Amino acid sequence: MGRSLKKGPYIDPSVEKKILAMNEKGEKKVFKTWARDCTIFPEMVGHTIAVHNGKTHVPVYITEEMVGHKLGEFAPTRTFRGHGGDERSSRVR
């Protein structure tokens, strides 16, 4: 279930402040954030943000298609190691 429209999107104040300051200066620096719940807003397009995945910071390049999504959606927290194990070799032939 999404967030209520009357509340508006959640934008982390520190992320917003850094992005707006970089846009004024014309910089494109990578900065770290732990705010996985921050909604991506249009001013972020073209920036790279290092989003924490619980272990490390994953660099996420923001494109126009990402606007409206959350930062955490692009920094996976779990590593997929494949389905099952050595099933075929353990079966009796």
Curated annotation (Swiss-Prot):
InterPro entries: Ribosomal_uS19 (IPR002222), Ribosomal_uS19_bac-type (IPR005732), Ribosomal_uS19_CS (IPR020934), Ribosomal_uS19_SF (IPR023575). GO terms for molecular function: rRNA binding; structural constituent of ribosome. GO terms for biological process: ribosomal small subunit assembly; translation. Keywords: Ribonucleoprotein, Ribosomal protein, RNA-binding, rRNA-binding. GO terms for cellular component: cytoplasm; small ribosomal subunit. It holds the Pfam family Ribosomal_S19. Protein S19 forms a complex with S13 that binds strongly to the 16S ribosomal RNA. Belongs to the universal ribosomal protein uS19 family. This is Small ribosomal subunit protein uS19. It comes from Symbiobacterium thermophilum (strain DSM 24528 / JCM 14929 / IAM 14863 / T). The gene is rpsS.
